[in-house]
Structures are given as C-alpha cells and as structure tokens.
Swiss-Prot record:
InterPro entries the record matches: MeTrfase_TrmA_AS, MeTrfase_TrmA_CS, SAM-dependent_MTases_sf, TrmA_MeTrfase, U5_MeTrfase_fam
Catalytic activity entry: uridine(54) in tRNA + S-adenosyl-L-methionine = 5-methyluridine(54) in tRNA + S-adenosyl-L-homocysteine + H(+); uridine(341) in tmRNA + S-adenosyl-L-methionine = 5-methyluridine(341) in tmRNA + S-adenosyl-L-homocysteine + H(+)
Species for this entry: Vibrio vulnificus (strain YJ016)
SUPFAM superfamilies given in the database record: S-adenosyl-L-methionine-dependent methyltransferases
Any one GO molecular-function label of the UniProt entry: rRNA binding
Record-stated family: Belongs to the class I-like SAM-binding methyltransferase superfamily. RNA M5U methyltransferase family. TrmA subfamily.
The protein's name: tRNA/tmRNA (uracil-C(5))-methyltransferase
C-alpha cells in the first residue's frame, strides 16, 4: 500500500473537489444534480496490506512513499478500520520474539468487517513447516483470548495454510434490513463498508418501481444482486471469477433469497448467448432458459476498464440501465455509446476512496422516448 494523508480537516475540501470534477466531466450528458454520499473521515477501509521490515531484533510494518519510493514505518493507519488498528501492534508484538513466525515474513494483509470479524494473512519467503503451524495456532488462540474474532492464513510459494477459515462474514445494513456476505481472502470486496451500505441503498431506491426481471453483469459475490432482488420478480446474474461465484451461492443461501440465479460467464460470453451467436452448455446444465426472462432493467458494475463496445450495444437493448463505475473515465467512454439511446435520470458520487483521486460513480439511465 502507498502513502495516504488522512486528514479529517481536509475531508470536506477533497470531497468538494471531487464533486466539481465529476459534475464538470458529465456536463455534456445533461446529468441531473449529483447525489453525494460521504465516507467516514477516518477508519473507513475494511482492508489493508503492509510490508514487514526486519531490523536486528526489531520488526515493524512499512509502506512506501508513492513519489520517492522511500519506505517509512507504520504503527497505526488511520484509513483502516479501528479493528485493524487495534490488532496491528498486538500482532507484531506477538510475533517478533518468535523465530518460527517472524523468519522471512515479508507482508501482512488484513481483511476486517463492520460485523467485527477479522482475517489476517501472513506471507513468507519460505516454505511453512509443522513448527510454524503449532506457533500460528498458539498465536491465533492468544488473539482470540484477547477478544479478536480472528482467523489466520499462512502463505508461501504454492502453499496456503488456513486456520480455521479463509473468509469473513460481513453484515451490511440496507434500509434497516441486514444482509450477510461471505468475503473470501484475495477476492474482490468493496473496501469501504459504510459507503458500500449507501451504494446498496441508492441502487435499491433507483429500482423501486421496477417491473419484470433484472439482469446483472459482473456480480462479484452477489453484493448488489441480493439487495436488489426485493425489487424484481427474478434476478439473473453473471460473474467470471470462480471464488466470487462460490461466495455468491453461499450468500444467496445465507440470506434465504430464492429469486436470484448466478451463472459463471463473462459479460462478453453472455452477450453472445443473448444474441444467439453461441450456445453454452452451462446455461442448459443450470436449467437457465434466457428466453423465459423478462428483463427490462440491467445492472452493470464493470472492472476499471469499463464495458467493451459489443457489451455496451447489448446493454442498450434494455429499458433501464443502472451502472456503477469505479472509473469515471471509462464510464464516460461507455456513455458516449449509451447516451445515443438513453438519458441519465439519477447521478451519484460515492466517496469510497477519501484523500485519493479515485471516485466511484453511479448513473441510472432510461431509454429516450
């Protein structure tokens, strides 16, 4: 992780700059007034990764200055959740005098939740042996006894040792209703828990009066699918990454939601299936008949690269498009195509990444009359 100047006194100023930037960027599309969703000013990041530096008997976390690439010591990290900050010094103290746990340890990754769970991954430049497992079990027990709801993972080349789980279970509150989400180590999750809740509430609000079914591309662990299911008869969601699909299935069952179906496909493959260019066995094997769906609304949350031209053209076939973007530059490129047929009816900024130039945006589009 790189330098981050977390300064609550600067929070409103940096937010105002983003509001101005996003408003100016989307002025050509006659977007309505921007809805702005703030982040907590500190302790907002549910994840953090640190390199580990060894100096004689000493051992501590470091980060790198993005401009100079110089390393600097980090004992606390105000961007990260309070849970991560509480654990950081205790973890280092517990490991620094233990040869088995400290030897060739080069990185520590933390994944925490609003629900109070935390997962710690210890990364090594050596193979892990039985002595490491014994010591790691004792470390886990010690931290559990100190009140941390914690699991541990040891990683080395081609090696992963899990004590006792490689995931956390997050609870997000959407308009007073709790949703539980399995979040697996090393797979994508929304980094800012409080803003993630606001994004879900906004998406639910945008689709309130919906008819028929919802199609969702790039659904990840089902983050949006589950909350949006209440507004639609059925939800058909696609995702390519296998661990995310498995988490999505877990989350559907855990939340007892019966009208969501996940299929493992890329957006590009799904476009081909929709257009009848190719038949896919996995649709048949899962008993999915695309023709039986009546999708007037499509939800997309693509990677930073946005959607390719063919996917944009397929998406244009839907009455309403809900688009969440972690990169407004590629959203703008996609809107050059989408705005030929649709106009923006809702426009939002979610401050997922305070004190950085990154912005998360949301637009609701409806077909022009």
């Amino acid at each position: 992780m790189a330098t981050l100047d977390v300064n609550p006194q600067r929070y409103q100023q940096q937010l105002a700059e983003k509001v101005q930037r996003l408003t100016d960027m989307f002025a050509p599309y006659q977007a309505p007034e921007l809805e702005v969703f703030e982040s907590p000013e500190q302790h907002y990041r549910m994840r953090a990764e640190f390199r580990v530096w060894h100096e004689g008997e000493e051992m501590y976390y470091i980060m790198f200055n993005q401009e100079t690439r110089e390393k600097y010591r980090v004992d606390q990290f105000p961007a990260a959740s309070r849970l991560i900050n509480d654990l950081m010094p205790l973890l280092i103290d517990a490991m620094k005098d233990n040869e088995s746990l400290r030897r060739k340890l080069f990185q520590v990754d933390f994944l925490s939740t609003l629900s109070g769970e935390i997962l710690v991954s210890l990364l090594y430049h050596r193979q892990l042996d039985d002595a490491w497992i014994e010591n790691a079990k004792a470390l886990k027990q010690r931290l559990n006894d100190e009140g941390f709801d914690l699991n541990l993972i040891g990683r080395a080349r081609k090696m992963k040792i899990v004590l006792d789980r490689d995931y956390v279970v997050e609870k997000l509150d959407v308009n007073g209703k709790p949703y539980v989400y399995q979040q697996v180590e090393n797979s994508f999750t929304q980094p800012n828990g409080k803003v993630a809740e606001k994004m879900l509430e906004w998406a639910v609000d945008c689709t309130q009066e919906s008819q028929g079914d919802l199609l969702e591309l790039y659904c990840g662990n089902g983050n949006f699918s589950l909350a949006l299911a209440q507004n639609f008869e059925r939800v058909l969601a696609t995702e390519l990454a296998k661990p995310s699909v498995e988490s999505a299935q877990y989350n559907i069952a855990a939340n007892k939601i019966e009208n969501v179906q996940i299929i493992r496909m890329s957006a590009e493959e799904f476009t081909e299936a929709m257009e009848g260019k190719r038949e896919f066995r996995r649709l048949k094997d899962n008993g999915i008949d695309l023709k039986s769906y009546n999708c007037n609304t499509i939800f997309v949350d693509p990677p930073r690269s946005g959607m390719d031209v063919d996917t944009c053209k397929m998406v244009q076939g839907y009455e309403r498009i809900l688009y969440i973007s972690c990169n407004p530059e590629t959203l703008k490129e996609n809107l050059d195509i989408l705005s030929e047929t649709h106009h923006i009816t809702r426009f939002a900024l979610f401050d997922q990444f305070p004190y950085t130039h990154h912005m998360e945006a949301g637009v609701m589009l409806e077909r022009k009359a």
